[in-house]
Amino acid sequence: MGRFISISFGLLVVFLSLSGTEAAFCCPSGWSAYDQNCYKVFTEEMNWADAEKFCTEQKKGSHLVSLHSREEEKFVVNLISENLEYPATWIGLGNMWKDCRMEWSDRGNVKYKALAEESYCLIMITHEKVWKSMTCNFIAPVVCKF
């Protein structure tokens, strides 16, 4: 009986020590992980509204990419550079409700912006590392995030 308690206690200690560590975050095949989110670059080119709809159809909770820090933006720029030659991709920032207020398509707070100017739909120009306003009917590749 004493040995059983000793083994049980040992397993409990191992479990508790491992539960305090953060497990590796895994994304589905073809998606890349960064800071508890998954990202995927798609080569299909479409307008902003179709791009947002496309992203929502890829995975539950997926939207056009939202960027909340310079570090996250660097990660996405590198991901795009590895997958596309095209220098511009849609991001999920736009004047969603036409009320002169910028908002991420995933409804996240706008904490970080690298805007060249404000307009209705934005693309990220990867080689310049800036965001630029563009007509929402412009055709560009897509980066989705969930």
Swiss-Prot record:
Pfam families: Lectin_C. Disulfide bonds join C27-C38, C55-C144, C121-C136. It is found in: Secreted. Interferes with one step of hemostasis (modulation of platelet aggregation, or coagulation cascade, for example). Keywords: Disulfide bond, Hemostasis impairing toxin, Secreted, Signal, Toxin. One of its GO terms (molecular function) is toxin activity. It comes from Daboia siamensis. Heterodimer; disulfide-linked. It comes from the Eukaryota. This is Snaclec 4. Residues 34-145 form the C-type lectin domain. Belongs to the snaclec family. One of its GO terms (cellular component) is extracellular region. Residues 1-23 form the signal peptide.
